[in-house]
């Protein structure tokens, strides 16, 4: 579970240290909480919601601290030896493109395509209507495809 929480935080904030801090803060908060976790219908959705909210808060804080400048650097969590350099660069490029999506689209796309949550789980985590989640993911994928096709050297073609 902690790994999933880290992945969501990392995908949203883009910095491994920030993601670790967020997950640690959430774990401490839950530990100190007076209410037992078994009172929640879906503990995983509850924890993901906490991570999501804390990650979005961290993004806002970082943006304000930098004077509104958007962060585009992506920390790669995988080694990049010479033979995988192109793959790593491509991966970083896709992450930058995902980060350029509107917040609501980026968030649900990450939860669906990178973390693997169902539409229903995403609706519970975000508090969105199920149909809105489905439409949002469709639009996010379409926007991402359009962004990637502008570069054209990453092999994504639109029909």
Positions of PLM-derived features:
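DNA-recognition helix of helix-turn-helix
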Residues: 126-151
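Amphipathic, Lys/Arg- and hydrophobic-enriched alpha-helical face
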Residues: 1-16, 33, 98, 150
